[in-house]
């Protein structure tokens, strides 16, 4: 279980580009040719966790929990299985808000605008990893209601995805 130690404004957060550059370097704990994990170590936040491929399913949850490469939690195990079942060669887990918290009730009450901006850079980057039309699965359910700011975060994602021509899915329904 992960309970945030403090609000993200009080911790050092790597800018997305810096975290991505670090994630491209060899890691002792996992194979970077197989995994994309940004940042590449366990932190109070996470931008991206997934497997590498040319036809990924981008899975979007609310916020990251405890998963790491080769140590997926049940949510990411399901995302990986659903991606494979639906013909994708990989999955990329992204979250509406990047703060780690096993329980959404533990998420910060007020969003960190800087962290959100960096998270949107991560989302835009994910869309470029897809050969062809990016497929984005809105996999968050009713938990989105836990914090009022989450819907504004999703609106930003929709704008970014629209510029890339992404197709959104809700469960097995095309939206």
Enumerate the language-model features and the residues they cover:
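Acidic beta-strand-to-loop metal/phosphate-binding motif
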Residues: 135-144
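Active-site and ligand/interface coordination hotspots across diverse enzymes
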Residues: 1-73
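Charged, often glycine-rich, active-site loop that binds/positions anionic groups
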Residues: 100-121
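Short, conserved loop/helix-junction motifs that constitute active-site signature segments
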Residues: 127-131, 160-162
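Charged helix-capping and loop-helix junction motifs
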Residues: 74-77, 119, 150-155
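Short, well-structured hydrophobic secondary-structure segments
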Residues: 56-59, 64-101
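Conserved small/polar residues in nucleotide/adenosyl-binding loops
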Residues: 173-175
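Structural alpha-beta junctions
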Residues: 83-91, 156-171
């Amino acid at each position: 279980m992960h309970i945030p130690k403090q609000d993200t404004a009080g911790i050092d957060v790597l800018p997305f580009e810096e975290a991505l550059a670090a994630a491209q370097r060899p890691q002792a704990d996992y194979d970077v040719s197989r995994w994309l994990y940004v940042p590449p170590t366990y932190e109070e936040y996470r931008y991206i966790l997934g497997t590498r491929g040319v036809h990924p399913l981008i899975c979007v949850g609310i916020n990251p929990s405890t998963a790491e490469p080769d140590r997926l939690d049940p949510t990411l195990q399901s995302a990986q299985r659903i991606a494979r079942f639906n013909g994708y060669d990989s999955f990329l887990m992204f979250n509406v808000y990047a703060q780690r918290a096993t329980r959404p009730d533990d998420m910060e009450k007020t969003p960190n605008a800087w962290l959100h901006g960096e998270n949107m850079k991560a989302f835009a980057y994910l869309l470029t990893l897809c050969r062809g039309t990016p497929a984005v699965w809105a996999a968050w359910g009713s938990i989105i209601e836990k914090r009022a700011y989450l819907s504004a975060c999703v609106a930003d994602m929709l704008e970014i995805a629209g510029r890339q021509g992404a197709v959104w899915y809700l469960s097995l329904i095309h939206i």
